[in-house]
Amino acid sequence: MAQTLYDKLWNSHVVHTEEDGTALLYIDRQLLHEVTSPQAFEGLKLAQRPVWRISANLAVSDHNVPTTDRSHGIADPVSKLQVDTLDANCDAYGITQFKMNDVRQGIVHIIGPEQGATLPGMTIVCGDSHTSTHGAFGALAHGIGTSEVEHVLATQTLLQKKSKNMLVKVEGQLPRGCTAKDIVLAIIGRIGTAGGTGYAIEFGGSTIRALTMEGRMTVCNMAIEAGARAGMVAVDDTTVEYLKGRPFVPTGAEWDQAVEYWKTFRSDEGAQFDRVVELDAAQIVPQVTWGTSPEMVTSIDGRVPDPEREKDPVKRDAMERALAYMALAPNTPIEAIKVDKIFIGSCTNARIEDIRAAAYVVKKLNRRVAPNVRLAMVVPGSGLVKAQAEREGLDKVFTEAGFEWREPGCSMCLAMNADRLEPGERCASTSNRNFEGRQGQGGRTHLVSPAMAAAAAIEGHFVDIRRLG
């Protein structure tokens, strides 16, 4: 019987299935960070349990680390406690960890693939919503809660119910100026933030196959914003080439065997999906969110929608509340929206290709950050990304134009560290969530691609980067 990619990943990891369909799944890799792991380790200590498979875990601090000068340490006592606690727990249990001043440190969903710890055919979990990122490698990856983090540490398994299969098929050539971020925002705009609820989404079609691994990671990263349990892309030569030579991958004869195995992780011809959604890539234009949910998105050449035209009273009410919070008037051209701050970073868009795309726009415009922009910051996703960008001179492109070049971390994606918006500030952000208060109490977030964020920094408002050529 023909199987989907998700079916293959699920079936190859089932240890036992209960009568109600609940399955015990074997977990190949757990990624840990400082926010959702302390209680899990404390539970192990209280129960006097060991970590079942130490080598299956990889840890890093990312949410609370400062992105400015780290020689002064972490100022906030709660943040410092969380980072110190992860350090102590990893030392006590012998878990591999990249500490704050290690060049390999970075955002957990960037360092996993970067190190080759994320591999095709794996089940991967982390106490973090955007674990779906790793599905780009033909893996089953999703976020879990703190009690589940403890369960995986203790047993290397997890109780789960199988999701339904959804295929999101994007065909055709992506227009100039459009990126993976625009693809996934367009998908969410089409199906909504509940469209993927109860599903695992496979992203397929010629447009997805043409993406680099970094682009695929951006798409899978935001599968959770469409309500899906997981997002994934079939393994192909692009996947294998990306992994070749990375620290955690097999070598020699084991590499050849692994590649042969990995390439089986694709949907069979004739495999049946419970839902299929199709998009024409040629119709996608640069996207900008206008509201307080990723589904509240439109094209750069569009306008802020008018709630009066929405027939559904629930949706109309949500639109009205969002516009009030965002301080936007209906029918305002998106290009007329001015911004106060720019954030280029996060597990969605802080890889080297993202940094290059933003730098290209800054060089093309050849001007400094607009006077009305109070802060424009670029936060690389890892120390290795930062070092690569600096070798290419990209840091100078940004700093000479008035941007701040920071140390790696989650930064302004969420208001959990020193990088945040003040009440009423408006930010063009390359992150994944634009909820109320996500980047700081009263902060207003617009999700865009790195190129769009860079252009907004220079112009002081959103602009259509397709005009840049």
From Swiss-Prot:
[4Fe-4S] cluster binds at residues 347, 410, 413. The keyword Amino-acid biosynthesis applies. Its EC number is 4.2.1.33. It catalyses: (2R,3S)-3-isopropylmalate = (2S)-2-isopropylmalate. It is an enzyme of class 4 (lyase). Gene3D superfamilies: Aconitase, domain 3. Binds 1 [4Fe-4S] cluster per subunit. PROSITE patterns: ACONITASE_1, ACONITASE_2. The keyword Lyase applies. Pfam families: Aconitase. GO terms for molecular function: 3-isopropylmalate dehydratase activity; 4 iron, 4 sulfur cluster binding; metal ion binding. Pathway: Amino-acid biosynthesis; L-leucine biosynthesis; L-leucine from 3-methyl-2-oxobutanoate: step 2/4. Keywords: 4Fe-4S, Amino-acid biosynthesis, Branched-chain amino acid biosynthesis, Iron, Iron-sulfur, Leucine biosynthesis, Lyase, Metal-binding. Signal peptide: none annotated. GO terms for biological process: L-leucine biosynthetic process. Its cofactor is [4Fe-4S] cluster. Heterodimer of LeuC and LeuD. Catalyzes the isomerization between 2-isopropylmalate and 3-isopropylmalate, via the formation of 2-isopropylmaleate. Belongs to the aconitase/IPM isomerase family. LeuC type 1 subfamily. HAMAP family: LeuC_type1. This is 3-isopropylmalate dehydratase large subunit.
